[in-house]
Amino acid sequence: MNRILEAIPFETERSLIRLLREDDIDWYIKTINKPFFNEFVDIKACEKYNDIIKEKLLRLIRNWMERTHPQTEIRTVVSFGGELAGGLTVFRTGNGVYDLGYWVVPAYQGRGIGLEILRGITTLARGYNLGVRELQLTIQKDNERSIRIAKKAGYRLIGQYEGIRTTNFVYRYTIDKKGR
């Protein structure tokens, strides 16, 4: 995970993906409390937990900077045209397996940014010796846009499970030993 952390920030065709900073936290929390975000996640953010979320994010940022704790989670923001337009999370779940989550705020949806984010992190994982074997996405069955994006980025459906609120599909991208 530390090798992935060191590879960020990175640029896609039109966006910059960089680590979440302290000055982004208020925007980040406000954004994840909006209806568009909660529509397609299997848990529901709740404003009463904002202080807990803020403290967790601050602790995460300090851990990245100090590099004193094993990293299991990376949160980034996506800048498009100099404005914050979304986010990408990377969670280490096993030996070389990483769960991804990405989102784009409504004002920037429909511009191909989600596909850029997913292709960008996939290219990064393939192109460097980062110890990544598989990237995985969990997508609610009704999130047709994200399903299309996953398929366009080369992810394959490998299974499904019943989540808290809906059926979730699991898509995976496997990186071979040559980084493809």
Model-derived segments and spans:
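Acyl-donor (CoA/ACP) binding surface of acyl/acetyltransferases
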Residues: 1-39, 75-180
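Generic, well-ordered alpha-helical segments
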Residues: 29, 49-53, 70
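A short helix-loop-beta-strand connector motif used in the catalytic cores of GNAT acetyltransferases and
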Residues: 59-76, 86
